[in-house]
């Protein structure tokens, strides 16, 4: 009767007054969103302190690395054992995880007691007891003969140094086993098992209960990257970027951080938020001054907080008509379970009455209403404080990922969260208010931390298996010193074949004479025109070469486009268009009608018969002008100049871009006798002794040989080094079977090799969770510029993920690490192969000259060499390693092949003038 009467009167004016009275009295416990955001800001600062190497020792929030580097992706499978030790009872579990299209977890477990004499005895006794219980469990399941992986949940303060190494800092929860503090608990279990000798296990991971919660929920929801426990105690963990964890080496990937957030405020950070009741609870606790945040929010203290408030308000004659009872004055008499019961929507007021009577009080209706309101304020503050710190964690993850809107899941366990009727809802609402730009899902952990320990173990096993499978594949792309020496030897053989008259025709490496017989000596001078034609745009340049004190090169140039109808029209139309552009340039430079020597960079396959005669073998790069193939391009140009009858030009030299690069660098460095291009394509040239150039008469002097080394291997001599990925790229190219070396080293193909490897990994479930997107199937999406960006040292994995997202590939942090590794392996092999080819060239020059040591410079151009962050360094190291008797310098060409054509012309004019004198 009294209960129904109380419920009916709940909202009477009297009750409202009582609620207002409590609200006024507990004003400092009711936290505004503004205050919560300030607490959140402070907590973010504390997190940073805990992560920093210099600030960590004094940080209150310790931010401990757990060495758990990945959350479940749903493909885990296998049979695992788990030990869950955190109190007077401990559990042993067998966890079977299956992945046959349907994720399923089966668990069997048994609870074992730890007698008090063992808890307080020696460490040897304790771990022998644990090993005995483990043996008993395995006997029952008849699995003793199996060596199963085991995960160990050990919920005591530990210093963790590896996933399977954790040193106990101090016992808590009534444990006093001697000889354990300061020791590695994994080692102690292993030794106890060895002492028995009747079974063996593989201890893979030791974790705390918070990490176990995150991993348990992470199996069901792959967005889960935060673990939260609000029970007797409180703690949280989350996945942090490795680059921010100063205590652990390495910058790539993520690691779970055990925050130990209960200690937030131990340094005084929360003094203005803590109330007199919080201070009283702390003073009466077993660890005064420690775990101050935990004492404001966790189940161990919530009931006691309510009791202290009731006592204080009764003393102030605001409750119970100023009367107290011995029971109410007894510490611990008001439990957190009582708070949950009183806040129950259905019969909370009735429960308040019963609990207050149990405490020896004679409560009036308004006393019950006031007690209900006190419980509400205390539990709401707890949820709000939790929300403030969670908001800081979510904000940090969002910042780490650089996302405008974060989608994340929080795995939660603990009696307060699960059993209090309103705590969870209040927590959820507060989090969403404090971080409105985060879509947060809360997922209850139903299977406790034992399953979590098994999940950590399952993930570690999956990662190890996948790593082994990937490494086996990537091994085929990693070249040993011996293999690279063999590539160098084979290149030298192919060079000899190309130089010899007898074998030249069948040789893939053509070693074409360029009729360039000297490099610049610095005495060149004069004004020269240069044409640079190699694509849909071409350049006309005026190059002024000065010698003496004013030695240098001054350049003016203009870029002209070639319309598609001209590219596909007649040869006459094409060369008339080129001459029209030259005329325009001369007029633009105020040099109309002037006759100048001209150098012509013509980057199409040609057979050169003299410095100023080059027969076009075939058009490439989209050109189809009729009447040109099989013709001398210099003659075609001269005929077009004659047709115009406006000016005359002395076409002195026609060269390709590689020779142009060598000559450009040769002007800066007289030791430059080799040219190399590693860009979209790849080629090399060098100064060969005339006696070895059998295709050209004469024994004296030297001539630059255009190697056309991209075709190295077209005769099958590299087949043992080519992988299935190289073969796939070749077969789908425009010229299958041709330019095989180029397809292993040049920018046009490296991205395709990477894409093929990524497809292979994804099909085998080693990447992108086994899901192949349509975008990944698209040829050419993986441009080489992305390789350069992905491998950039200053680029965080976050930016790597952004690049992959731009390519339409949704990746996890682990995926990004794998993609980066594939890019590294492919680019490194390219640089090493390039270095092996270059080592063959410089060693040949040294041997030609009969020198013990050669000092030589290589002029280099090309986007891959210039823009890739590591290509040049790896190539240089390889050349040094494979050609130790050569002192090789590398000089980047800054002005392209047009300047090179002008310098060849300048050298030819110098030699011609010297001959005339």
Swiss-Prot record:
Q: EC class of this enzyme?
A: transferase
Q: Which CDD domains match?
A: ASKHA_NBD_HK2_meta_rpt2 (cd24128)
Name the chain's protein. Answer: Hexokinase-2
- Region ranges (Hexokinase small subdomain 2): 521-655
Could you tell me in which tissues this protein is expressed?
A: Predominantly expressed in skeletal muscle, heart and adipose tissues.
- Species whose genome carries this gene: Mus musculus
The UniProt annotation places D-glucose 1 binding at: 155-156, 172-173, 208-209, 235, 260, 291-294
What family classification does the UniProt entry report for this protein? Belongs to the hexokinase family.
